[in-house]
């Protein structure tokens, strides 16, 4: 997963977002949460997607959430098998490690990133460290971070937390509220359009939109993104909340 697109906003309408995040005990996700999606391209069912909170790991002394995002699908002679993993600090939500394994048609790419928030650097595939940011986010951890935020209708928010500084600021535009029906049921939803200066399913050119449940859980109900081979849409079909209590 990569960036998100927002339309232009007047400077006075854009709110910088504090790096502070809710206490761990109030997070809307927990270990064992698994969200399963139906994957469509141009309204044709082509496969499945999952978002999972796999566990709690220790990364260089930091206690970290380990999350995974997978999309598997096939249409005619084109297949998609993408796998992403993120590890981010349970307290600050700063990304510590990010893994991409992209297999789309004839395109394949695997990358591993290590982030070092304490010295604001990152490295790619074991290469020398490059300048980063102090509270980094990657494409996967960004979605979990957004789930912790209060989102005000009509507002645009800026984040200078993407781990590659040249891709900042990341913007998030709150577009509208609506009631939608997905295979998992009917939900009140809040629709956002994020933007990172990057390529992928959340790039500016993709005009991506994400529907989160308009409640304290902020479940990702639907995601739509324009890709070279058509419009990809994920719709929630099964919810396993893991260790999160009612």
Predicted regions and their residues:
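Acidic, serine/threonine-rich low-complexity disordered tracts
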Residues: 12-117, 151-246
């Amino acid at each position: 997963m990569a960036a998100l697109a927002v339309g232009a906003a007047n400077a006075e309408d854009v709110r910088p977002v504090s790096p502070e995040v809710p206490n761990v005990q109030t997070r809307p996700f927990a270990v064992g949460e698994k969200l399963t999606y139906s994957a469509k391209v141009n309204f044709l069912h082509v496969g499945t997607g999952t978002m999972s909170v796999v566990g709690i790991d220790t990364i260089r002394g930091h206690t970290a959430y380990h999350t995974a995002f997978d999309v598997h699908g096939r249409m005619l002679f084109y297949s998609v098998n993408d796998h992403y993993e993120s590890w981010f600090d349970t307290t600050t939500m700063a990304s510590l490690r990010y893994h991409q394994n992209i297999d789309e048609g004839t395109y394949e790419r695997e990358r591993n990133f290590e982030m070092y928030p304490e010295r604001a650097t990152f490295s790619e595939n074991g290469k020398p460290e490059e300048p980063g940011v102090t509270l980094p986010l990657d494409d996967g951890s960004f979605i979990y971070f957004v789930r912790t935020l209060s989102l005000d209708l009509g507002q645009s928010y800026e984040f200078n937390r993407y781990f590659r500084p040249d891709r900042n600021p990341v913007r998030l535009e709150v577009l509208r509220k609506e009631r939608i029906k997905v295979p998992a049921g009917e939900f009140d939803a809040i629709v956002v359009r994020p933007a990172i200066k990057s390529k992928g399913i959340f790039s500016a050119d993709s005009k991506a939109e994400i529907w989160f449940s308009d409640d304290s859980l902020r479940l990702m109900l639907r995601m739509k993104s324009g890709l070279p081979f058509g419009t990809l849409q994920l719709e929630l079909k099964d919810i396993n909340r893991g260790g999160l209590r009612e």
